[in-house]
Regions:
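Positively charged n-region of N-terminal signal peptides that target proteins for export
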Residues: 1-6
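Short, low-complexity, disordered segments immediately C-terminal to signal peptides
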Residues: 25-37
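Sec-dependent N-terminal signal peptides
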Residues: 7-15
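Functional-site microenvironments in short loops/helix caps that host divalent-cation chemistry
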Residues: 24-28, 49-50, 56, 61, ...
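A short glycine-rich, aromatic-capped structural motif
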Residues: 40-117, 121-124, 132-255, 260-274, ...
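Short, structured beta-strand segments at or near domain termini in extracellular proteins/domains
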Residues: 432-448
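Short proline/glycine-enriched turn/loop segments at secondary-structure junctions
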Residues: 393-397, 423-430
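C-terminal motif of bacterial Sec signal peptides marking the signal peptidase cleavage site
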Residues: 18-19
Length: 458
């Protein structure tokens, strides 16, 4: 009898607790779902919402050459956010600096631990791991330390500013760590040593969902780890053009503030993907610090998304602004490209222009034609339009190193600027005329689309 009464009390307590969590038990035994706070997806900074829709992808039969690898096909894409502009030098430098600083802080913390230095003692100890004192660890950190080893519980002291002035290095240990980040003395130029950018490596993991969904195995079998050198290849300005003087662009384009708002180039498809991973990591770290929901991953657009966005709501347009001409009624060019043979400057730009130049298209996207070509997350296959899906179509083949680029660039003729023109480059190649922009999936449908749906069902 006592045991039965005890079980009843336990069950009653469970239902009371559950009812309290549901807001006072007002569900009256009905199926009302699990409670939660209301949520609305915020618009990411610098992005614009592209509503879902259908469009005719590819080239018309009138263009025999282009239709060989891009025959017309009606497809549908979901809603997503897209960067209004190409990723700029300034934005990519934020990524490079984050990687550089993280590597230095990790090496400083390791050196502090090796030499027995702790925070509060000055010198390199100020950069020691925050959990050096195990007595200050919380229960979860102690569990990680005891179960998986020290590295799982490690936290860097990011509040302490790094010291760049050699005259202010706090001690010899700090000097040793910083010295290893620079090129050796024999590679100094005019007596000035610079950082060895080949050491700026970003490590991340990703889950191959495509293979995981179609093959048997453990989750760990589909987790991939990548280590990517993130610094752009500035030599592209020289290598891409023979018998041409472009050294000023090689010397200044990426790092100088004069080009901060210009699109980053010299970035491979592999590096562009790494940037997307970092952007997601960086944003979600902030979200977690505020106790907010994490956001969807930033990524490269698939080819169908890119063309849909480039059209700007004009299904039959030749260019993002419609067309069929590349200049307006005042004879001003609508994009940065090569108008005539050997003529790069008639549009008032010899190379690239600022990322927010010319008029945006109907979706408020700048330079979807010209300036720099853009990486997509699609493998290039001239026959892919024949077999790909009609819903969010995409072909991504790990064995195919050719990746689709779109939009044309400052060194291309008008044909390459057309919204349906396809081109490709190898994923590990960097060029002076290829950049990228990112997208983020939109969860649900937009308020405008909800209103349309409601009107449609009345």
């Amino acid at each position: 009898m006592f045991m039965a009464r005890r079980i009843f009390v336990v069950l009653l307590s469970f239902f009371v607790m559950t009812a309290c969590r549901r807001g006072g038990g007002d569900n009256k035994g009905e199926l009302v779902g699990v409670g939660g706070k209301s949520w609305k997806q915020p618009t990411p900074y610098g992005m614009t919402l592209i509503p879902s829709g259908s469009f005719i992808m590819g080239s018309s039969d009138d263009d025999k050459t282009a239709s060989l690898n891009a025959p017309v096909k009606t497809v549908s894409v979901g809603s997503f956010y897209m960067d209004e502009t190409e990723i700029t030098n300034s934005e990519y430098r934020q990524f490079v600096n984050w990687v550089r600083d993280s590597i230095i802080r990790t090496q400083l913390a390791d050196m502090a631990e090796q030499t027995g230095q702790t925070s509060g003692g000055g010198g390199i100890g100020d950069f020691a791991y925050l959990d050096t004192n195990t007595e200050k660890m919380n229960a979860y950190q102690q569990y990680l330390q005891n179960t998986y080893g020290a590295q799982k519980a490690r936290k860097l002291n990011k509040k302490k500013a790094l010291i760049w002035d050699t005259n202010k290095y706090p001690d010899e240990y700090y000097s040793e760590v910083m010295d290893k980040m620079y090129l050796p003395e024999e590679e100094a130029y005019n007596g000035k040593r610079i950082m060895d950018v080949q050491k700026f490596e970003f490590k991340y993991q990703w889950l191959d969902m495509e293979k995981a969904a179609r093959a048997r195995g453990k989750r760990k079998d589909f987790i991939k780890e990548e280590i990517v050198k993130v610094y752009p290849d500035t030599t592209v300005w020289i290598r891409d053009f023979n018998y041409s003087y472009n050294e000023p662009m090689h010397n200044d384009y990426f790092w100088h503030e004069a080009y901060g708002d210009y699109p980053v180039v010299g970035v491979s498809w592999i590096q562009a993907k790494a940037f997307c991973e970092w952007r997601t990591l960086n944003k979600n770290a902030y979200q977690k610090s505020k106790g907010d929901y994490t956001v969807n991953a930033f990524r490269l657009p698939i080819e169908s998304e890119w063309e849909y966005a480039a059209r700007g709501g004009l299904p039959g347009g030749t260019y993002p602004w419609g067309g069929p001409y590349t200049y307006d009624d005042k004879a001003c060019f609508m994009a940065n490209f090569k108008p005539l043979r050997g003529d790069y400057a008639s549009d008032n730009a010899l190379y690239t222009v600022e990322a927010k130049s010319y008029e945006p298209n109907g979706y408020n996207l700048y330079n979807m034609a010209g300036n720099v070509s853009e990486w997509t997350n699609t493998s290039y296959d001239p026959n892919s339009y024949e077999y790909m899906s009609t819903m969010n179509p995409n072909v991504l083949d790990d064995n195919n190193r050719r990746k689709v680029i779109r939009g044309g660039s400052w060194k291309d003729v008008a044909f390459m600027l057309q919204v349906n023109t396809r081109d490709y480059e190898y994923q590990d190649s960097a060029r002076s005329y290829i950049g990228f922009r990112t997208v983020q999936d939109f969860m649900g449908i937009s308020e405008k689309q909800q209103a349309k749906s409601a009107r449609g069902y009345r």
